[in-house]
């Protein structure tokens, strides 16, 4: 048999390659696979002394009965034990010499496959299943009325370090809660007397509102320093806005941002600074409004204090200027603004004007000077009733009418008291004999000025003297300002070097070198 297989293998190896056929495919006859193979293609016969393999006989456990083993053995026996094993017929393909040597896979005998799921080794004992799955409830009871211990109620093991850590965490949370409650209660006490302002609920509510107002109130509780002594402190405080009142900013593609100063700003600030402590109270941020304020008042002679967006507060999402943080008497404060929302908290202290749109011939700011100077001249105890009387009106026009009426009344009273004091054309011997009355509107040289006119003339002279003084000493003030900037810069550098640990710079050796 080995010899036949070897000869068949060698014959297929040394066989010459079949040349390509030029015959048309339609004339090529392909042998049918249903016909019997040639003797060379037939497999060798199986010897008669070859016996089939013994059937699989699994071992049966002692717990199972003989009937179950018999059923398993009967299921695993083949259908016909005496049938010889026949190899499969090879597949013949003409046209390829190598395909003749290849054989198809052997066909399985017609034997029923055994059912391995019924093996005794895969059978699970019911007692083992009961042990692996503990029962719950009533199933935990066993013989004798006892219950099995499942370990469900056993506590988790915690180390001493973990217990200590948890204890300190609980203590920290407790201390934080006690401190929060104590802080809320302490904030309800008066700082001077130490007494509570109200009940616990009212105190807690006020403290919580104050806590949330921290983000809405100004950055400082006191926006202005304490007033100066009487000779130097002005009796009234005038808070003025920047954008729309003193300047107007516009933007275009050609020039970018440009800021124009309103006509009469210098005269407005220089003249009213005699009667008012002028405070620039702008709703713009510091980095945008401060450079403009420096251009308007470089010496800080007329606007000594400047407040910006950080000094305002937010009420219902709106920017509001609260004068209660100014450290000044509200009855002596006037807020001049162009936005009604800015004076929403104290409307009785505000004067709302139309914003300036940048027109060059505007006189709205100068027209407000007579009204404001009259308050400084007559020195009322409270400015709020006066402002309320002009609320909703055109203040320059209404005040001009009031002033004209007051002057006419004063002249009439003076003429009634001095009927013979007549001068001018026709005044002489005949006038003294027949009498004469001055024409309406004619002026008399000896007619006295009103109190307002006298104070106004005096204020004008003071304003002119101040302007002359600032113009003559402008270079000196610029030099002082520059020296102050250099001094601040040197202090800043020294503080940084001192923070880093470097020694401070001494000016002594430098002076000695210069003298030498």
Swiss-Prot record:
The UniProt record lists the keyword Transmembrane: yes
Polar residues: compositionally biased ranges: 1-25, 96-107
Transit peptide: 1-17
Cited SUPFAM superfamilies: HAD-like
CDD domains: HAD_FCP1-like
Domain spans labelled FCP1 homology: 231-375
Lineage top rank: taxon: Eukaryota
Mitochondrial matrix-side positions: 18-166
Subunit structure: Component of the TIM23 complex, at least composed of TIM23, TIM17 and TIM50. Interacts with preproteins in transit.
GO cellular component: TIM23 mitochondrial import inner membrane translocase complex
PROSITE patterns, per the entry: FCP1 (PS50969)
Membrane topology note: Single-pass membrane protein
Biased composition regions of type Basic and acidic residues, renumbered to the chain: 136-161
Similarity remark: Belongs to the TIM50 family.
GO-annotated biological processes: protein import into mitochondrial matrix
Feature: compositional bias, Low complexity: 64-81
Mitochondrial intermembrane domain ranges by topology: 188-516
Keywords on record: Membrane, Mitochondrion, Mitochondrion inner membrane, Protein transport, Transit peptide, Translocation, Transmembrane, Transmembrane helix, Transport
Protein name, as recorded: Mitochondrial import inner membrane translocase subunit TIM50
Cell compartment(s), UniProt: Mitochondrion inner membrane
Organism, scientific name: Cryptococcus neoformans var. neoformans serotype D (strain JEC21 / ATCC MYA-565)
Keyword Transport set for record: yes
Task of the protein: Essential component of the TIM23 complex, a complex that mediates the translocation of transit peptide-containing proteins across the mitochondrial inner membrane. Required to direct preproteins in transit and direct them to the channel protein TIM23, and possibly facilitates transfer of the translocating proteins from the TOM complex to the TIM23 complex.
Gene (name only): TIM50
